[in-house]
Amino acid sequence: STTGFQIIGGAVLFLILEKNNVLAGMPVKEQILCSLFHSVTARTAGFNTTDTGALTEGSKLVTMILMFIGGSPGSTAGGIKTTTVVVLIVFVRANLMEAAGCNVFNRRLDETAIRKASVVMCTNLFLILTGTIFMEIMQPFSLSDVMFEVFSAMGTVGMSAGITRDVCMASRMVLVFLMFCG
């Protein structure tokens, strides 16, 4: 269900944000298929049917979120994994409601699982922010393009905003390091 929500939600947002941009001029059926394809591939393989460098800022953000979350455990997709996100959402919800514990489907979440999910999320965010800052110091590209490259590297997706070929060697090393960490 988490994967379905990600795919459908990502596709709908991509379609809305790109209808008058990279999807303009395509038949509606093709726009829907491209949106679904983009939503799936942003979490996994990094293939593209549209020019990712020409995406709107909103679409880049949605794509970065999909790359950050990635796929489900057991898949070859990168990212922090859907289960990590679900554990953290349940944890936040339980704390906002001041519940005694975190329960999912009538089962209590173990404190260790919550701790591990928090560490994965915080470590990934730290590496993404650090990588973005290093690349911004060294490169004259827009923040959204640099962040797109960093999220893609960390999520081991392979998508590009089109700047990878033009970055300096130090920035390439940052991206390679993030790929290994991801």
Question: Predicted segment positions?
Answer:
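Membrane-proximal intracellular helices of multi-pass ion channels
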Residues: 1-182
